[in-house]
Amino acid sequence: TAAVHPGENTLTVQVYRFCSGSWLEDQDFWRMSGLFRSVELFTKPELHLEDVFVKQSFAEDFSSATVTFDCKVSGAGTVSVVFNGQEQSAEVGEPAEYDSGVVFGKGEADPDVEEDVQDVSFTFTVEHPALWSAEQPNLYEAEIALLNEGALVERTGMKVGLRKFELKDRQMLLNGKRIVFKGVNRHEWSCRTGRTVSREEMLWDVKNLKAHNVNAVRTSHYPDDPYFLQLCDEYGLYVIGETNLETHGTWQKLGADGSDEWTLPGARPEWRENVLARAEAMLERDKNHPAILIWSCGNESHGGKTLWEMSEYFRNTDPSRLVHYEGIFWNREYP
């Protein structure tokens, strides 16, 4: 990059309090500006793990689990995955197919990456899996390593919770057993530092929720800090991950004159990309957290085609979770 030079460099960040997207952020909280969470600037090697999506399926009696790591890798080299005492590897760079549960193929080029992004999947079988739940938040460890001619280039560690969540006969089932949410809405707020919440305060929240027999949290009304979700994985809290969308101020005129001209996002094409991008950003960041059982389209943003498209995006991209939306009323255009 031409943006930095040898020696010391100055990085200047300009933060805007409001932007056009602020019309989609009408949540009920104090309006503050600034950086509330950690910000990272990093470089990546030519051989790089761009993404991983952990997918699961189970025997009917949960006596075994099939766990697949769908990886996207840029560059050429060796990809190695270690999970549950098993190791699998594959060479990336040329389309091929491998035995032992490894399938490899060339994906579409990512416009944000110079190299083509290639898809490679690793499938493992776990006998008698230790399942994840709020009562027993069992976690497995996985490690993905990228090597160039045997030399380690990059290593990624992650924790994997094995669980199956479904809606069956009008009941929510986790690992085949009915569960009931005893939950709360949670805003990110500190009595001491406002919108910036420390890790110690997040841990305090989680421990106190557990101590008071709360088993579920809705991240009202935006995706929470990744560290909070990590704590929910480790301590055992069910999470409704909510998209950063609330526009109740734009449709309050409906009660006065019945007009729909102010309502956002509705079916307005100029807002579609912005709204769906928020849903995608949340899902792609948080999709491997076992604690998240439900994706939420947002809060109090009326109805319309765009919200329906968001719900369909969640269902089609991640059928392992349910989809929620709290919109005050039932939009009868979409039964």
Where are these regions (language model features)?
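Aromatic- and acidic-residue-enriched carbohydrate-binding clefts of CAZyme catalytic domains
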Residues: 182-187, 195, 242-287
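Hydrophobic residues in well-ordered beta-strands that form the structural core
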Residues: 239-241, 325
